[in-house]
A protein has these predicted regions:
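Conserved histidines in hydrophobic membrane contexts and catalytic metal-binding motifs
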Residues: 1-480
Length: 480
């Protein structure tokens, strides 16, 4: 009764696995590398470490004037920092962002490699790197390390090579003049056999996000089908001989059979969760706010009232000022360190004392008014199953529970870090937990977690190598 369906599964497994077996080995091996060397990114500590002291005398226009000059509608944030060529406002809205010089409100886009080189060199010096031999390399829309979508608003990017011992390279946004990415020689080398291989990330493919998204999703689904069909066939091929379970296969094929059954649970969950990493809203919600939700949480801030410029008495420790809309009020965020800041309400004028972070009751009022049906807001414990950290280490992350939906709000900036509905909470376990082993019990035991990941991935790679041998022998038979 099961012969014909089983034969179909054998053929599916065989002809999907022959072209995919090399990919399986690559995925397992590169997964080990990725665990220890993630894809290059500019950390918040690195970004903040490259910020300079304000030249207050050159901040001649107010945030209100910057918002008006930007011509952007629905502004939610304004940021001020000192660039090597003077202080700059960055006005942000859902529709985009615009950088303006704070002394005369001219557009602050970067138009020359000399300015980009000066910005990169100053950033490097402030971080304690050596920019003495820094050179401009190129202006490019994409390269291997700048393909992620989060950089789209900054393209094209100026590449600055420091030519230091570590082989550090910096990327300067042509739109804002910010350093948006850094890499080292070691990071680049390891990532070619790590993230680039694992995510199938060649620049020519990844720069077209839609093509990459569809191609890798279908490729991953084919891998799921190959693994599942192999598991079913492997179970049906088992035989009982004299009270023993035996395999009908010999040599490499037997090794493939037994190893496949032994690591079936890990291989299946890892391949399925890897496929789910490419979901991007296909089966599960994305965790992002809708435009309507974002607008209601921001409220209708009166940017025209933000007419005061930066006072001469500004603390010399201040490296960045941000104004953000939250519940219709404008908060001013003075950052004096990567983990130190002061928040105050400036519009409407308030006599409330400044505090480092937003409080639970403030967030509860805003989210309850914007969304409705909220029962509570409280700080999320670091060992919570759905914890996300703020970019400012000591800052609490608050969770507002509104019916079936949870809103996770950064106490440092008022930003929504993630919207967790039932689908998203399920996705957290099916993808993140199963693919990266970020189970709370393992996250507090990083060495144990690393050991488990390395051992299981090595086991999976070994199993996949037996598949390569079996596939090669099958192909030789087919084309003999």
């Amino acid at each position: 009764m099961v012969v014909r369906p089983l034969r179909t599964l054998v053929l599916i497994h065989r002809w999907l696995s022959i072209p995919l077996c090399l990919l399986f080995v690559m995925w397992f091996a590169s997964g080990i590398v990725m665990h220890f060397v993630p894809f290059p990114a500019l950390t918040e500590a690195e970004r903040f470490g490259g910020l300079s002291v304000f030249d207050v005398s050159k901040v001649r226009h107010s945030p209100a004037e910057a918002v008006a000059a930007s011509t952007l509608k629905g502004v939610t944030r304004v940021r001020l920092w000192q660039r090597s060529d003077g202080p700059v406002y960055l006005v942000s809205a859902a529709s985009g962002m615009k950088a303006l010089h704070a002394d005369d409100l001219r557009a602050a886009d970067i138009g020359s490699e000399q300015v980009a080189l000066a910005i990169g060199s100053e950033h490097a010096r402030l971080r304690g790197l050596n920019p003495a031999a820094a050179t401009f390399v190129e202006l490019a829309e994409y390269d291997q390390w700048t393909v992620p979508n989060g950089l789209d608003g900054h393209r094209p990017l100026y590449l600055i090579a420091l030519n230091d011992v570590a082989g550090t390279e910096l990327y300067v946004s042509s739109r804002t003049g910010e350093i948006v990415r850094d890499t080292t020689r070691s990071e680049r080398a390891w990532n070619y056999v790590g993230s680039v291989a694992h995510w199938i990330y060649p620049t020519a493919l990844r720069k077209d996000w839609m093509t990459w998204n569809v191609a890798v999703w279908w490729l991953s689904l084919a891998a799921v089908i190959a693994a599942l069909s192999g598991l079913i066939v492997g179970l049906f091929r088992l035989r009982r001989v004299r009270d023993r379970i035996v395999s009908p296969f010999r040599k490499w094929h037997a090794w493939h059979h037994w190893l496949g059954l032994a690591c079936a649970a890990f291989v299946m969950t890892w391949i399925v969760s890897g496929w789910l990493s490419m979901d991007h809203g296909r089966l599960f919600s994305t965790g992002a706010l809708t435009r309507s939700e974002a607008d209601r949480i921001a409220g209708t801030p009166a940017w025209v009232e933000l007419t005061a410029t930066v006072p001469a008495s500004l603390s010399p420790a201040t490296r960045e000022i941000e104004w953000f809309a939250f519940g219709g009020r404008i908060h001013q965020r003075n950052r004096t360190g990567v983990d130190a800041q002061q928040l105050s309400i400036v519009v409407p004028a308030s006599t409330a004392p400044a505090s480092p972070f937003l409080q639970a009751d403030q967030i509860n009022v805003v989210i309850s008014h914007a969304v409705g049906g909220c029962s509570s807001t409280s700080a999320v414990a670091p060992d919570d199953h759905y914890f996300l950290a703020s970019e400012v280490a000591p800052a609490p992350v608050y969770r507002s529970i509104c019916g079936d939906v949870w809103y996770q709000i950064d106490g440092a900036s008022g930003a929504n870090l993630e919207k967790l509905d039932a689908q998203r909470r399920t996705y957290r376990w099916l993808y993140r937990a199963l693919h990266t082993f970020d189970f709370p019990a393992l996250m507090v035991r990083p060495k144990l977690r690393s050991a488990i990941i390395v051992v299981l991935c090595a086991f999976g790679a070994t199993f996949s190598i037996t598949g390569i041998v079996v596939a090669w022998r099958r192909l030789k038979l087919e084309f003999r």
